[in-house]
A protein has these predicted regions:
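Long, contiguous, secondary-structure-rich segments that constitute the structural scaffold
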Residues: 61-79, 83-174
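Long, low-complexity segments enriched in small/aliphatic residues
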Residues: 1-68
Length: 174
């Protein structure tokens, strides 16, 4: 569908701010910046920093409910640097317990040289084994929900879910 040439000057008529400009630093956000100084950014001894990740076929959780997108090598594992595995007596492919302040999950771990030491990564969109999800195909796909580890009370000036920077402990499962 061709909508014709772009027309300059249309944005201001579509903005509902008094100035007809995009406010990139609203007062509400600026007033909240002081809270950032209160955020603990360093993990404690023995803790690692959990970050999320996405895959082109795992971008959203509903994608696990279609067989075509769940084919191929498993992508649900916790990625962890080999040095962090060794220091905890964990072997690539073993099951581990990942514990945060608010919850814990058990998942398979995968050694990944491209992970920064001290950082672990769980993919977004897994963990449909819970009753009532209505995702029959996705319930058969292994993996855990990163939401079980993220802290709903975590300070975050953006107001978004804090899926990255979560302090966790990783130990052999069992």
């Amino acid at each position: 569908m061709d909508l014709g040439p772009l027309q300059a000057g249309r944005l201001p008529e579509r903005l509902f701010t008094k100035s007809k400009r995009i406010d990139a630093a609203p007062a509400l956000v600026l007033r909240d910046l002081a809270r950032l100084d209160q955020v603990e950014i360093s993990p404690r001894d023995g803790e690692l920093v959990l970050i999320g990740r996405r895959h082109q076929r795992d971008n959203n959780s509903w994608m696990h409910n279609t067989e075509r997108l769940t084919r191929g090598k498993p992508r649900h594992q916790l990625l962890m640097h080999p040095d962090d595995l060794a220091s905890r007596g964990i072997t690539d492919g073993n099951r581990v317990t990942v514990r945060s302040r608010v919850g814990s999950v058990e998942v398979e771990v995968k050694a990944a040289d491209d992970m920064m030491p001290g950082v672990v990564s769980l993919p977004h969109g897994y963990g449909h084994q819970v009753d009532g999800t209505g995702m029959s195909r996705a319930a058969k796909v292994p993996g855990v929900s990163i939401n079980d580890l993220t802290d709903p009370e975590r300070l975050d000036v953006s107001g978004n879910a804090a899926l990255n920077g979560v302090p966790v402990e990783v130990t052999p499962a069992g």
